[in-house]
């Protein structure tokens, strides 16, 4: 990126209240863009709406239902013209019903509304795991990616590796003197995690960077790829402790999936839990790096890096009380 001042654009944002959405909105506002965020409060009432407004300072906040095309048009776009659609929207759980409703169908509605509003460019936050799809949410994301590419709009599809919050769930247990949990030997997967702020900046830069147009963009954070074992090896010294690990066999995850799936045939709520377990197993056994289609292997060197903050910088800030860990629906530990 050059130091040139960005051309201000009207930007319509989905998913702005999530952790990545908030940093993306902040980066867009800082770059001088006129940002309108379309959100649905987690709870009804004026207080919840005010919280959303405070989270998205500098942006205009509009409320409605992203799954309802009429609400998108009436409450969101409101007959106005926009230049860019930015989506950080994602299903909360990844179970099939949720995934197809949000990761695919809601985005299809938004794409149609955006085209009607004159949008010419869409920046989509996707996920690097879609390059090896095994679960419903990955197929749903891929289906929308394909629709966006075929839409005629300029597109920037950003596929980040791992988020800091996804790799920070064990800080509290290690502080309590417990071992760091790894699957297998703790070395069978690796990732190049990226911070919320660095990813938000990357997404915002897609509006100005011509090299990111009509591209699928895998991106990780700075530095070398790290394994779960290396995460623990860095965390313990920050606490003045000797590294200790608890090794969990992947076969245990397989057993949990099998049991929940069997019970889910007679107890429907457990079927959803079985899918969550399958998602957990996927992340426990697959690296979040660029996949080389020729070899079928993950390649850290082929995974682009962006930003300045490393996972271990973040660990240090959390332990100093300078930052906090926001856990999500995909929390494992």
Per-segment meaning from a language model:
Residues 8-33:
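N-terminal Rossmann NAD(P)H-binding glycine-rich loop of SDR-like oxidoreductase domains
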Residues 106, 186-207, 215, 227:
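Substrate-positioning beta->alpha
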Residues 166-173, 206-217, 241-243:
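Glycine/proline-rich active-site loop of Rossmann-fold NAD(P)-dependent oxidoreductases
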Residues 190-197, 219-237, 249-258, 309:
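Substrate-binding strand-loop-helix patch
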Residues 91-177:
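Glycine-/Pro-rich loop/turn segments that contact NAD(P) or position catalytic residues
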Residues 43-117, 129-131:
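NAD(P)H-binding glycine-rich loop region in Rossmannoid oxidoreductase-like domains
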Residues 20, 199, 203, 231, ...:
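Non-catalytic, hydrophobic alpha-helical segments
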Residues 84, 251-333:
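A hydrophobic C-terminal alpha-helical subdomain
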